[in-house]
């Protein structure tokens, strides 16, 4: 089962999900390990990230709507400072 799902959502879909009311997270250019205790959905507002997993590497850029599944262990490589809306589901 894929633990990283990258999609493009329309403005209407984002509005229906209430993304604009979600929290905001920012991070400067860096690298760090991360694991997910629950599912997270996020909309990348700015930046460029590579997420390295056992399944492979994922390139994530602004405009991507990403779901990180519970149990995922990965390494984030923030290539350009990132800003995202996020929500744990």
Locate the predicted segments by residue.
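Double-stranded beta-helix
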Residues: 1-3, 17, 83-89
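Cytosolic regulatory regions built on CNB/CRP/Popeye-like sensor folds
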Residues: 2-9, 14, 22-23, 57, ...
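Conserved short histidine dyad/triad with adjacent acidic residue
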Residues: 9-11, 18-37, 69-70
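Short histidine-centered beta-strand/loop micro-motifs
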Residues: 32-36, 53, 77
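Short, conserved beta-strand element in jelly-roll/cupin
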Residues: 37-50
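Short acidic-glycine-tyrosine-enriched beta hairpin
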Residues: 54-70
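Ligand-binding loop in jelly-roll beta-barrel domains
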Residues: 70-89
